[in-house]
Regions:
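C-terminal transmembrane-bundle signature of multipass membrane proteins
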Residues: 1-46, 61-72
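Intrinsic disorder and flexible coil segments
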Residues: 9, 32-35, 39-40, 50-51, ...
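Charged, low-complexity surface segments at secondary-structure and domain boundaries
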Residues: 12-16, 42-49, 95-102, 136-139
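Non-transmembrane, amphipathic alpha-helical segments
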Residues: 15, 19-22, 26, 47-54, ...
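Soluble C-terminal extramembrane regulatory/interaction domains of multi-pass membrane proteins
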Residues: 58-170
Length: 170
């Protein structure tokens, strides 16, 4: 009877480990691409301990790198360079359109797929005719029905599906 109790107490740890392994496989392609683009994100001590902690840290790195990508892309989109290489000046008091920050009226999976396609189109070795146009900051906004973790996982899942379908491994 005692061994049943002991085995039962280990079950949550085993479930966490298998869940974390699955999540790690899901986020790895996106983490690799964003890590290539932003090698300085996440410099420092890596957490040791349960795999779920390490997965959470990697999700945090993805979130940080997505923020950096989006900030740079949004700035470039709002500050186009003219033929002379000069950037237009912004008028004092000019503000961004608030509607640009509202969540897009699409299902969360489509929203995540759009973000994944934007990252995928800008990857190293992407065909020159691939359009890597930034969809806008609103597309990165987490849907209300998703937690932070679920949202990063959804984007990573959509990115992983793109890499698998375009490499013929599906």
């Amino acid at each position: 009877m005692m061994w049943v109790c002991n085995a039962g107490s280990l079950l949550p740890s085993v479930e966490d480990w298998f869940g974390a392994r699955h999540e790690l496989r899901t986020i790895q392609p996106l983490l690799t691409e964003l890590g290539r683009r932003h090698p300085d994100v996440g410099i420092g001590v890596r957490p040791r301990g349960p795999l779920v902690f390490r997965v959470a840290e990697r999700m945090s790195l993805i979130s940080d790198a997505l923020f950096l990508e989006a900030t740079a892309a949004d700035a470039a989109r709002k500050r186009p360079v003219d033929a002379t290489g000069a950037r237009p000046t912004r008028e004092p008091g000019e503000t961004d359109d608030v509607s640009e920050l509202e969540s897009p009226p699409v299902p969360p999976q489509e929203q995540a797929r759009t973000i994944a396609q934007w990252i995928y189109a800008g990857r190293e070795g992407a065909p020159k005719d691939t359009n890597a146009e930034f969809p806008g900051l609103a597309w990165l906004r987490q849907p209300t029905s998703y937690s932070d973790r679920e949202w990063i996982l959804e984007i990573a899942q959509q990115y992983r599906l793109l890499t698998l379908s375009n490499s013929g491994s599906v």
